[in-house]
Amino acid sequence: MRLKIGFILRSLLVVGSFLGLVVLWSSLSSRPDDPSPLSRMREDRDVNNPLPNRGGNGLAPGDDRFKPVVPWPHVEGVEVDLESIRRKNKAKNEQERHAGGDSQKDIMQRQYLTFKPQTFTYRDPVLRPGVLGNFEPKEPEPHGVVGGPGENAKPLVLGPEYKQAAQASIKEFGFNMAASDMISLDRSVNDLRQEECKYWHYDENLLTSSVVIVFHNEGWSTLMRTVHSVIKRTPRKYLAEIVLIDDFSNKEHLKEKLTEYIKLWNGLVKVFRNERREGLIQARSIGAQKAKLGQVLIYLDAHCEVAVNWYAPLVAPISKDRTICTVPIIDVINGNTYEIIPQGGGDEDGYARGAWDWSMLWKRVPLTPREKRLRKTKTEPYRSPAMAGGLFAIERDFFFELGLYDPGLQIWGGENFEISYKIWQCGGKLLFVPCSRVGHIYRLEGWQGNPPPLYVGSSPTLKNYVRVVEVWWDEYKDYFYASRPESKALPYGDISELKKFREDHNCKSFKWFMEEIAYDITAHYPLPPRNVEWGEIRGLETAYCIDSMGKTNGGFVELGPCHRMGGNQLFRINEANQLMQYDQCLTKGPDGSKVMITHCNLNEFKEWQYFKNLHRFTHIASGKCLDRSEVLHQVFISSCDNGKMTQKWEMNNIHSV
């Protein structure tokens, strides 16, 4: 078949035109200075719908858009693409999980064998007495509502007509939401900093941050006041995003209402919803993965209010040294009245270091003379062995290099110690920052709580403690088991990857940590002696056991039905002749007869001997024996009588499950 010349020419013209358009399109799309149509649409949207100016944004009026002031880190001239690394590791771990079962959710643990070097230069803050700091507000911050309730963090006391509503909200949320709902979300707060804090000048080349807030069935106004306070008091050019992680809430106000409300900020505030209840610990790790814009991750509990000029002091140490983790000074927001006051305890300035006792209960101890000598002024950051865990800042990449939280920790408890030990023993530092203050609401008595999901099983917090001490405490773990003997046989899962992490990173021993960083712990909480016996204290051949009934610091113990669940019925008697429950000792009461339980250290209340063969507890000082009344449910001491069955006891081990 013969083709006509005209047909061939027309075909060549069409093909040539198509190729020309392709070349032209490629050249236009490759020009970085010429925004794409989608980019222009986003810019038009930002111009027409600017983010609300909440004050203190550090930018010119009308310019509230996020503008990073520090570039993303480069190593040897190559931008670090962490996201591609995470995707590869996620795919690899998914393959391993399907191949070998869910042995350990260690997606983050295998990503790094070494930490990246510090490549960013940041100048030290400078104290100029009498010269107002460059991040200090020039005028008092505006009230949310002029003259409104709760402004300047003054207490709001409701009348008796609100009693029923207040009690119902405390049961549901842990706070007096009736009062909270009357207070402006943008309320002003009091300034509890030392005067010297106002005269620090910070290099403005600070790292940017993503603020991560995890919530589960939180009250509306306490959650939103947290968000509002961050936006109101954080310079806008450093606030990359606020990431809300909804940990499977079922409250209606946290669904569509929340989704619509955060549109007020045009994408600055984002919400991600877990498909099941993960618990606070793993939800925070999820938050780290979702928060991709800021160079620093700042974690806040869902019921906080940041204070005046909180950001620069908190992030400056991290900008100087990427392996530093910082913690603000945490003030107390009264859950009934919403007054903000300093936390009690600490040294003469109210400063304390984070600590623990050997049963792994969180403690605060005064700042030591050694730590004070390391500072030139009393408002400089200082070292702390541990953090409380709810509020802290850490460089995002460094947190990933550390493996985030141990993926084997469940729901809540122990994660604050795990991340603290990991930071210190593996080359980082943990600093408390006196000039950064954040108020925190503590749950009130009467809260019904948020029970863990069924898939978690029993004793998640105790299992977390066991897992942490098995990974990080080395030979010191024996002291934990002396304090919590019921946990000795508790299954804690696979920790092989965590131990490999320690080995790969040449992490230091717990002995080094106790001698160099946590050297003051044993002065406040001496190493516990070995136990002679432990378990429930049951009346011989009866179904009644000694029960503290949750009382501490002077309450009388009672006799109650044995339940074999430990808790208030779990006691131990040690080689120092102390009969103890956690950090409390049994002793005779003021009447010289009834037995009470009170806080003690290892030098107090060495009063008891247990004669196992005789089924007898003897009070050494008085020579009397431990006795009971099964009718009155009382526990007391009385003259010893070998034939008296109410003086015969047995201690039976109880293992947690």
Curated annotation (Swiss-Prot):
Cysteines engaged in disulfide bonds, as pairs: C197-C435, C426-C507, C545-C562, C585-C600, C625-C640
EC number of the protein: 2.4.1.41
Membrane-topology annotation of the record: Single-pass type II membrane protein
TM segment ranges: 7-29
Lumenal side: 30-657
One family name in Pfam for this protein: Glycos_transf_2
Region of interest called Disordered, as start-end residue ranges on this chain: 30-66
Pathway this chain belongs to: Protein modification; protein glycosylation
Binding site for Mn(2+): D301, H303, H440
GO molecular function term, any single one: metal ion binding
Annotated ranges, domain Ricin B-type lectin: 532-652
Swiss-Prot/TrEMBL keywords: Disulfide bond, Glycosyltransferase, Golgi apparatus, Lectin, Manganese, Membrane, Metal-binding, Signal-anchor, Transferase, Transmembrane, Transmembrane helix
CDD domains assigned: beta-trefoil_Ricin_GALNT7, pp-GalNAc-T
Job of this protein: Glycopeptide transferase involved in O-linked oligosaccharide biosynthesis, which catalyzes the transfer of an N-acetyl-D-galactosamine residue to an already glycosylated peptide. In contrast to other proteins of the family, it does not act as a peptide transferase that transfers GalNAc onto serine or threonine residue on the protein receptor, but instead requires the prior addition of a GalNAc on a peptide before adding additional GalNAc moieties. Some peptide transferase activity is however not excluded, considering that its appropriate peptide substrate may remain unidentified.
Family: Belongs to the glycosyltransferase 2 family. GalNAc-T subfamily.
Protein name in the entry: N-acetylgalactosaminyltransferase 7
Protein source organism: Rattus norvegicus
Gene that this sequence comes from: Galnt7
